[in-house]
A protein has these predicted regions:
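Short amphipathic alpha-helix that is part of the acyltransferase structural core
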Residues: 1-31, 118, 130-162
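A cross-taxonomic marker for long C-terminal extensions/tails that follow the last structured domain
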Residues: 163-170
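Conserved small/polar residues in nucleotide/adenosyl-binding loops
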Residues: 176-178
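Hydrophobic beta-strand residues in large extracellular and virion-surface proteins
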Residues: 54-56, 65-66, 92-94, 121, ...
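Acyl-donor-binding surface of acyltransferase catalytic domains
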Residues: 70-133
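Short glycine-aromatic motifs
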Residues: 1-2, 42-44, 109-114
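Conserved donor-binding loop and adjoining core beta-sheet/short helix segment
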Residues: 27-82
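An N-terminal domain-start capping segment
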Residues: 4-35, 80-104
Length: 178
């Protein structure tokens, strides 16, 4: 297992897999700010196999597993080889429509269990939004970052939600988004 030291390394993994022209399958979607923070903190690692890269985001609370590969068959073969290398608890997020059932089965067959199944919904049409002037409500500041983090961990499950880190919260605060 090797540490990822730049976003360019991740882009090279994507290019490697796409250049094979055998298909492209991933659960990793690049977020430049978030993933740069993971790299700076030394939390992002990879293991490479033929036709497949596994990326691991390792933290004190949750280990997230991501993959970049060609097909679900290739994923299954390489997952069998990968699991003995990293025997700690891992969380895998799989996002998609009904077609991902086969992908879910790849992980279940290797001993993973479904922890949470979420459904995303959208609304057609515009949502009426009324801005209400509330004098006692204001945007959070840097000194509030730990409280925001504590609230997120109190009300959301870190195993089923990818909660932001303290550094990500500071970034959102700087944008006046909280």
């Amino acid at each position: 297992m090797d540490k990822i030291d730049s976003l360019d390394k991740i882009n090279a993994f994507v290019s490697d897999i796409r250049s094979l022209r055998k298909g492209y399958l991933t659960n990793f979607f690049l977020d430049r700010k978030k993933h740069s923070l993971w790299i700076e903190k030394g939390e992002l690692f990879y293991v490479s196999f033929p036709d497949c890269y596994f990326l691991l985001h390792l933290t004190n609370s949750v280990n997230n597993l991501f993959f970049i590969t060609t097909t679900s068959q290739q994923l299954a073969e390489n997952l069998k080889a990968f699991l003995p290398i990293f025997a700690e608890q891992m969380v895998v997020d799989i996002v998609g429509d009904a077609k991902i059932v086969d992908l879910k089965d790849v992980f279940v067959e290797q001993g993973f269990s479904v922890y949470e199944q979420l459904y995303r919904m959208n609304r057609i049409g515009t949502l009426e939004f009324k801005e209400i002037d509330t004098p006692n409500v204001c945007f959070a500041e840097d000194v509030d970052a730990q409280v925001v983090l504590d609230m997120l961990h109190s009300y959301f499950d870190p195993l089923s939600e990818q909660l932001p880190s303290y550094e990500e919260i500071l970034y959102f605060l700087s944008l006046i988004h909280i």
